[in-house]
Amino acid sequence: MESNLTTPAIVIFATAGCTDVWGDVLLGIEEEGIPFVIQESPSTDVIHNAWLAACQSPLLVGIGCSREKLVVHYKNLPTSAPLFTLTYQQDNHARRSIGNNAARLVKGIPFRECHS
């Protein structure tokens, strides 16, 4: 699946009404200065959504999320092997760090430690 976006951005495939849960992740991406685009997805397979989002992203990084789980994927990884997985129970610092790290993957700089 090739990218159909012209603007460089991390693509986020979200199931209905879940982006409000992951605000700290979005803030982490913004802190690193990387744009993102949110698209609704009818599928509930978060890992597959993340991989499809990475395939559509000109930056090769995608996120899939539901209300319970968020996954960061990279286009060059196998579909079943996401880079990061985050559950709703993890704290705000861990959520923000995952957003930072998704953006840092784009930048090619070292990841921040995630403490939950």
From Swiss-Prot:
The protein's annotated pathway: Polyol metabolism; 1,2-propanediol degradation
Annotated residues for binding of Mg(2+): E31
GO CC term, one of those recorded: bacterial microcompartment
InterPro entries, A to Z: B12-dep_deHydtase_bsu, Dehydtase/Dehydtase_re, Diol/glycerol_deHydtase_re_ssu
Main subcellular location of this protein, as a coarse class: other
Names of required cofactors: Mg(2+)
Source organism superkingdom: Bacteria
Catalytic activity from the UniProt record: ATP + H2O = ADP + phosphate + H(+)
SUPFAM superfamilies hit by this protein: B12-dependent dehydatase associated subunit
GO process terms (BP): propanediol catabolic process
Location in the cell: Bacterial microcompartment
Keywords: Bacterial microcompartment, Chaperone, Hydrolase, Magnesium, Metal-binding
Recorded GO MF terms: hydrolase activity; metal ion binding
Protein role: Small subunit of the propanediol dehydratase-reactivating factor (DDR), which reactivates suicidally inhibited adenosylcobalamin-dependent propanediol dehydratase (diol dehydratase, DDH) found in the bacterial microcompartment (BMC) dedicated to 1,2-propanediol (1,2-PD) degradation. Reactivates inactivated DDH in the presence of ATP, Mg(2+) and free adenosylcobalamin (AdoCbl), by mediating the exchange of the tightly bound damaged cofactor AdoCbl for a free intact one. Expression of a cosmid containing the full 21-gene pdu operon in E.coli allows E.coli to grow on 1,2-propanediol (1,2-PD) with the appearance of bacterial microcompartments (BMC) in its cytoplasm.
Record text on subunit structure and interactions: Forms a heterotetramer PduG(2)/PduH(2).
Protein family (similarity comment): Belongs to the DdrB/PduH family.
Name of the protein in its database record: Propanediol dehydratase-reactivating factor small subunit
Organism: Citrobacter freundii
Underlying gene: pduH
